[in-house]
Amino acid sequence: MGSRSSHVALIPDVDQIRRETGFSQASLLRLYHRFQALDREEKGFLSRLDLQQIGALAVNPLGDRIIDSFFPNGSQRVYFAGFARVLAYFRPIDEDDATLRDPKQPEPLNSRMNKLRFAFQLYDLDRDGKISRNEMLQVLRLMVGVQVTDEQLESITDRTVQEADEDGDGAVSFLEFAKSLEKMNIEQKMSIRILK
């Protein structure tokens, strides 16, 4: 097995990744070590199979969809920069960063709106900008498994879509999705404290 150093300078494009993700150098170093540990064959990239070894994703009902987010546009590999970018959505929001942020700069990946966009994409499988009843049903089925009957699940799905669908088109747009989650503390629910 090759040498695995603990120096942040060994991370390719570390400064750009730090700017894009908002992770500190210490957090990036921890993530890089995790990336290397998952890359058991030292290929320099991760495959879906590598990510399926993460226990928290293996037991998460949306684990496969979260793993899919690491591989946009049908790619089969994720390099460290892409790995860090996806995990940045789960970085806790630092209120100091929010007040000091330059409004001319793009919103950080871990902002409330970007966390909501990430969550929305877990539902919007066909990427048409709307969550159809069928897409909602698929996600709810993953989340509840066999704990409810198909009839109950159909009813829950219909009620969920109906409550969020303000324009009556039978689907949930991103704005409707965001509005339906206004009162939810998405910042806390989509945060991994160990990465701070």
From Swiss-Prot:
GO MF term set: calcium ion binding; protein domain specific binding
GO BP terms, alphabetized: cellular response to calcium ion; intracellular sodium ion homeostasis; positive regulation of calcineurin-NFAT signaling cascade; positive regulation of cell population proliferation; positive regulation of phosphatase activity; positive regulation of protein import into nucleus; positive regulation of transcription by RNA polymerase II; protein transport
Lipid attachment points (N-myristoyl glycine): G2
InterPro entries named in the record: Calcineurin_B_homologous, EF-hand-dom_pair, EF_Hand_1_Ca_BS, EF_hand_dom
Annotated CDD domains: EFh (cd00051)
Binding-site residues, Ca(2+) 2: D165, D167, D169, E176
UniProt name for this protein: Calcineurin B homologous protein 2
Gene Ontology CC terms, in alphabetical order: cytoplasm; cytoplasmic side of plasma membrane; nucleus; plasma membrane
Function description: Functions as an integral cofactor in cell pH regulation by controlling plasma membrane-type Na(+)/H(+) exchange activity. Binds to and activates SLC9A1/NHE1 in a serum-independent manner, thus increasing pH and protecting cells from serum deprivation-induced death. Also plays a role in the regulation of cell proliferation and tumor growth by increasing the phosphatase activity of PPP3CA in a calcium-dependent manner. Activator of the calcineurin/NFAT signaling pathway. Involved in the cytoplasmic translocation of the transcription factor NFATC3 to the nucleus.
Keywords linked to the UniProt accession: Calcium, Cell membrane, Cytoplasm, Lipoprotein, Membrane, Metal-binding, Myristate, Nucleus, Phosphoprotein, Protein transport, Repeat, Transport
Coiled coil regions in record: none
Phosphoserine carried by residues: S27
Gene3D superfamilies assigned: EF-hand (1.10.238.10)
PROSITE patterns: EF_HAND_1, EF_HAND_2
Gene: Chp2
Pfam families, sorted: EF-hand_7
Signal peptide residues on this chain, from the entry's feature table: none
Subunit structure: Interacts with PPP3CA. Interacts with SLC9A1/NHE1; the interaction occurs in a calcium-dependent manner. Interacts with SLC9A1/NHE1.
Entry superkingdom: Eukaryota
Main location: cytoplasm
Intervals of motif Nuclear export signal: 137-148
